[in-house]
């Protein structure tokens, strides 16, 4: 009988030791997922929330003109990065290369370092698997006495790289949205639609969701 009791105690201790690590792993896995939500990363589309963009802005540091961008792909198409064109400002990260449907890309931008009176303004382009281009424009000015935050999304027929011409089209001609702390939406054509939000401050957040129309 005593042998059975000892065996039972040993088995119980072994099982307890095996079970203990599980309690420690779960928080670590959550921390790992959170750490992936940085500019230049691709995350699950459902994880694109404002708090993610807040962390990107915090990581940029003490820069008075900066932007955190998140674009969710629910288009049913895969996206492949082509390029970013900066009219002013820059980014220290690479535009995420491949964004499958169901995922979201994270990106950022900031004014040029140093005592220069510039904002962060630009456009980036993605080739979609249907042969067309998705373009996203953002404009965070230096002087809010003269300018405001603006953003835009547009699909172009065929493959079109981001450049000055694309920026001018999206900023001046293609009905851009003002960064007014509100949500806006539109039909993009090619079976797609979008909704997005941009705030009005110099630490800008741009959240966009592209989906089937």
From Swiss-Prot:
Residues covered by region (Trp-rich region, which is important for the binding to lipid membrane): 139-154
Superkingdom classification of source: Eukaryota
Region (N-terminal region): 45-64
TM region positions: none
Region (Plays an important role in the hemolytic activity): 37-46
Signal peptide: 1-19
Motif position, Cell attachment site, crucial for protein stability: 178-180
Positions with a binding annotation for phosphocholine: 88, 121, 139, 141, 167, 171-172
Quaternary structure, from the entry: Octamer or nonamer in membranes. Monomer in the soluble state.
Biological function: Pore-forming protein that forms cation-selective hydrophilic pores of around 1 nm and causes cytolysis. Pore formation is a multi-step process that involves specific recognition of membrane sphingomyelin (but neither cholesterol nor phosphatidylcholine) using aromatic rich region and adjacent phosphocholine (POC) binding site, firm binding to the membrane (mainly driven by hydrophobic interactions) accompanied by the transfer of the N-terminal region to the lipid-water interface and finally pore formation after oligomerization of monomers.
Protein name, entry field: DELTA-actitoxin-Aas1a
Organism of this sequence: Anthopleura asiatica
